[in-house]
Amino acid sequence: HTGSDLSQVELLTALYFRVLNVAPDRLDDPQRDIYIQSKGHAVGCYYCVLAEAGFFPVEWLETYQHANSHLPGHPVRQKTPGIELNTGALGHGLPVAVGLALAAKKSNSTRRIFLITGDGELAEGSNWEAALAAAHYGLDNLVIINDKNNLQLAGPTREIMNTDPLADKWRAFGMAVSECEGNDMASLVAAIEGLKQEGKPNVIIANTTKGAGISFIQGRPEWHHRVPKGEEIALALEELKDE
């Protein structure tokens, strides 16, 4: 899922190296923040960030999707250090995050719950049931980052199941909404660090580009699940070096 991974590189980097109260030596800390990768198919980038953050050896990345690997094709909590929830079936991440945020509130915990969800994923009705509950219970310890790259497996999101105007929908469901350029680190960090806990769940609509950073991948829906091969790998790496 190369295209899906590349749209969220900055999102995950900002979270793990600037925002989240998590650490490899505190995996069971009851006060740690929790991050959920709701768009579970985009796990390749997630593994890279976890490795760089020290949750497991970088060498493990060479075993991605191998038989009996610690790094399967979708997040599995029982296999990979740092993973909080098994995901991949779209529409499951937000309902679980709402439950975790509610539990934290009831136990007077200071932890926050973060998740990244794709815009195509928002066609799943379970997200909006969860959003209603989050607003009803005033879960201002919940931060939803919407990776809005406007593409999904079969084409443009607006043609498959249009969710625009997205900000208006989130606000109608009782969320505090902000927007940023999700592939621009400065814009993204400013949006996250500017969040306020004022009785409403927070939604950041991160406007991103699917396949960002690689010219022959970005903005093309066929790269939702394609993998570069041969000369494509060399070209992609060369372009990334220039970024």
Predicted regions and their residues:
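Globin-like tetrapyrrole-binding proteins
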Residues: H1
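Glycine/aspartate-rich loop-and-adjacent alpha/beta segment that forms the canonical ThDP
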Residues: M185, V189-E243
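General structural feature for long, well-ordered alpha-helical segments within catalytic domains
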Residues: S4-Q8, Q31, A42, P57-W60, ...
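Glycine-rich beta-alpha junction loops
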Residues: E10, H41-A42, N149-N150, D184, ...
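Thiamine diphosphate
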Residues: G82, N86-K196
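Cofactor-binding active-site loop characterized by glycine-rich and histidine/acidic residues
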Residues: L6-H136
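Short acidic, glycine/serine/threonine-rich loops at helix termini
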Residues: Y47-C48, V76, S126-W128, A154-R158, ...
